[in-house]
């Protein structure tokens, strides 16, 4: 993928970091914040939008309501109560969560509000039994100084219910996650490159982890991105779980938006308008035409009682297949996403990708004839039941018309390959209204003093402290930049001074680079694996010099467990090590006498190759020197 000039493009990126807080109980009740599957009962709800305090209905809420889905909630015994079921008013806001949020606000030089007011944010996708999420702004403004990125808001809010399953008409959630305290940090649109977006997310994540009061693991932190380019509009991208995906998401989204603007230009060049699209919009039932087709998808749809609709796309030849992201997404993919989300139909084909999928040239010609399509026109085929097809036709028409505006205002979901898909229209400002069951909480001096206990150490202070621990300036800088900085702190607290902080830092940084350079799959290594190795050194089970070899063997063999590799590299008993050294010396006596004092390096090399990290290099060297001294005498 060729790199765009982001400065010329006018790229602007803002981040919203959502991190679960590790508090003793939930935000508005006393239930545990652990996830549990111990449910015996369920409850069912249908949700509908409410008016905001401005008397308006949010478009995103309206979109979800139109799906008409039933929501089923599993009720865990130990991690939910009547508050989660919306059968009891919320309790007072969790003071511990407030203190953690205030600590982060202090660290980011934000302006802390005088009073905290809880608001209701309308959300009716079923992720909350109430139809809204409770949220409260704690601070405004602030700065991530070394990146020049402003902080807009810091808020505490309740996490959503955990989605278990989703079908056509029903979604199942668990209430165990609902109400876990989250901190939300929103930056200004000051980020100017994909790499900077990753750095900013990393630094905010590190700041949060260094409080020692946030949860860790998959699903505990989520990054949302707001991305725009010159001539476009802000696009929200939800649910980025992996930090390393952020640069690709920014690159791909910038490219997608750039090409959507190019399509807008091309439509203008062709002299096409919205009115011409509408006046030449032809829809035909082509089921009979495809009754003997070899296309498996169409054939299967017809056999299930479905129909095949053909839609003329006036003067859109080449537009439907226009690559928005090379080899990943076309304009036709965007239309298919809308149809999937709004009409709940798959099985969409367009003329720029045919003949393919079992659809022949002869069938294509018949479709063109039936739709009165010229060589300048495109067409779309879609399969399904009549009711959904009628809805799909409206969706396709509306998405084609949106192409004349360039970039539609959307909320999109992050995918594992760094691309995104349409989720829903962007929510408007008409989604907030005050929470009437919770009184305001004034920020007093005692609360601020308590919060200061959680304020994380500054990078400059860390650098000085790490150097006093024995790290070189270069290694100290490297560990401060590393995503596993908080793991380093944790392991140093647990296992030093017996295991040197230098060994711990080197394992997390340099050793992992070495393993990767040798072909190891370092994505296989998690934080628990690193701790297991450091703990094994601490307990004298293995030598620190064996860490790199253990990790290399572990990451280059798919079907091995770390504990088995560690067992293989357990430290040699002194007697066995001495025997290996004696054997090497006796096998190289002539060379030793010839090299004299320089023989140490030769013997050291040969012993190390036999020991393979199962003994400390320092210990081996001392034993070799003492034995060579006897030989030389």
Swiss-Prot record:
Keyword entries, A-Z: ATP-binding, Ligase, Nucleotide-binding, Protein biosynthesis
Protein family per UniProt: Belongs to the GatB/GatE family. GatE subfamily.
Gene of this entry: gatE
Protein name: Glutamyl-tRNA(Gln) amidotransferase subunit E
UniProt-listed GO biological process terms: glutaminyl-tRNAGln biosynthesis via transamidation; translation
Domain of life: Archaea
Protein role: Allows the formation of correctly charged Gln-tRNA(Gln) through the transamidation of misacylated Glu-tRNA(Gln) in organisms which lack glutaminyl-tRNA synthetase. The reaction takes place in the presence of glutamine and ATP through an activated gamma-phospho-Glu-tRNA(Gln). The GatDE system is specific for glutamate and does not act on aspartate.
Subunit structure: Heterodimer of GatD and GatE.
GO CC terms, sorted: cytoplasm
Catalytic reaction annotation: L-glutamyl-tRNA(Gln) + L-glutamine + ATP + H2O = L-glutaminyl-tRNA(Gln) + L-glutamate + ADP + phosphate + H(+)
GO MF term set: aminoacyl-tRNA ligase activity; ATP binding; glutaminyl-tRNA synthase (glutamine-hydrolyzing) activity
A Pfam match: GAD
Top-level EC class: ligase
PROSITE patterns (UniProt xref): GATB
EC nos: 6.3.5.-
